[in-house]
Structures are given as structure tokens and as C-alpha cells.
Amino acid sequence: MNIYQTYEPSQIRELIRKKEITGPTAGLAEGYAQANLMIVKKELAFDFLLFCQRNPAACPLLDVLEPGDPVPRKSAPKADIRTDFPKYRIYRKGILQEEVSDISAYWEDDMVAFLIGCSFTFEHALMLNDIPVRHIENGHNVPMYQTNIACKRAGVFHGPMVVSMRPIPAHQITRSVQVTSRFPSVHGGPIHIGDPAMIGIANVDQPDFGETSVIKEGEVPVFWACGVTPQAVVMHTKPEIAITHAPGHMFITDQRDQQLGVL
């Protein structure tokens, strides 16, 4: 068992601020919702808000912060999004410039932060149903892939959907769809089951983000829309600056995962 599995979200965030947790967050603070990050300048914030509204599977919004305010008052009112992710990415004109563990030096008064639901949230529910989650079992980051599925454009924002993949035993696929469909605020049910080539993935063993998960005999690759989609969109849109989380390195909110369930 991961030693941080039973920690409270505030404890995890404190350890992240202290740089004692620096890796992927799958399995941490079990039972609490996790979130992806997208930060843009205020002048682009409405376009991105509209992008999320038009692409709810990939970008389900959990929280939108006021311009210049780094405190997610809805999802974790004592947190600071500048310090409470294990790792961030700085993009300039669509190019990844660097990865950092603190964005305080990059934060500006006209920046707007968006917290987007993460599928790590429903993994606890999968495991409660005895459905294996390979990347948690093996202690690595979830594999993520850029697809040939185009997101609906909103203002300047456009680009392909990114998906995460979990190998599911064939006899448990129906149950995995039922379980995850309860959580539309964190991507909901899968968007594709089976042949990766049908959604533009040439080699499932070579993810664009994260790390490879072994697909065992009798298992089927199942794909969910992913909150790394905004990073693919940033690469296409090329804003002057955008700040995101590093894939797999999420924000732990104070919201219980079951609070986001619809059934």
C-alpha cells in the first residue's frame, strides 16, 4: 500500500510544498478528487472557459479562480495553486520551456487558473469494485496519448483530445463503464474501448505522456478523455504563456470523490 494513501489532502499538499512528494499523485489521499491545471492570461480566459463548456468530457471544470487569485476557494480554500502541485509545465508560444515545482515566480496579477477534473478520482471506485488499476499496482504514471479526435473549437483554442488508458480484464469492461460513468465531473465513462488505431494511436506501448502500462492476456485497452488535453491544445494554439501541471502530477482537492458521483 502507498504510505500516502490514507493521508488527508491538506497533509499531501503540505508535503508537496516541502518538496517531499514530487512524483505522480495516483493513489494519494484515497477517496478525494484530484484536478488538472490550466493557467492563461485573463484576455484568453473566456475563450478557454468556453472551450471547457464545449468539451466537457476532456475538460470538466471543478473550479475557476478569480484573476490574480491563486486560492481555489471552492475546491480547497486553504491551498495555493502556485505551490501545491508536485510539478508544473511552462509553455511559451506552444513550446514547453521548462518543468518546475513552484510557479510563484511566474504568477502574474492577470492570470486565471482553471482546475479540471482528473480520472485519478474514479480509480478508488474502480478498485472498490475489484477492477485492477495497473499504473497504481505497478507504481508508475498513467499512459496518455494524443488522438485523432478533434476537440470543438472555442475562440483561439483548438486541438486534439488526449486520452488516458487503463488495461481492463474483458469480463470487467461493462462494470468499469458503469462505475466511471457515475463521475462525469472527472471525465465519466470511456470514450473508446479496444483497437487504439481507431482513435489514431499507432503504438499503445509508446504513450505521448506518462509511462507504458502492460496489457496482459485477456485484457482490453480502455480509453478515457484526459485533462492533459489542454496541453495538446496549447501546442496548437500557441498562446504567449500557459502554465499547466505536469501530466500525472495533480492537485489534491478537499472534495470527496463520492461528492462528484451522480448516482
From Swiss-Prot:
Instruction: Name the Enzyme Commission number(s) assigned to this protein.
Output: 4.2.1.-
GO molecular function ontology, one term from the record: lyase activity
Q: Establish whether keyword Lyase is in the entry.
A: yes
InterPro entries xref list: D-Glu_cyclase (IPR009906), Putative_hydro-lyase (IPR038021), UPF0317 (IPR016938)
Give all cystine bridges in this chain: none
Keyword DNA damage appears in the UniProt entry? no
Mind listing the UniProt keywords for this protein, alphabetically? Lyase
Similarity annotation: Belongs to the D-glutamate cyclase family.
PANTHER family in alphabetical order: D-GLUTAMATE CYCLASE, MITOCHONDRIAL
Which HAMAP family does this UniProt record tie to the protein? Hydro_lyase
Q: What is this protein called?
A: Putative hydro-lyase BPUM_0381
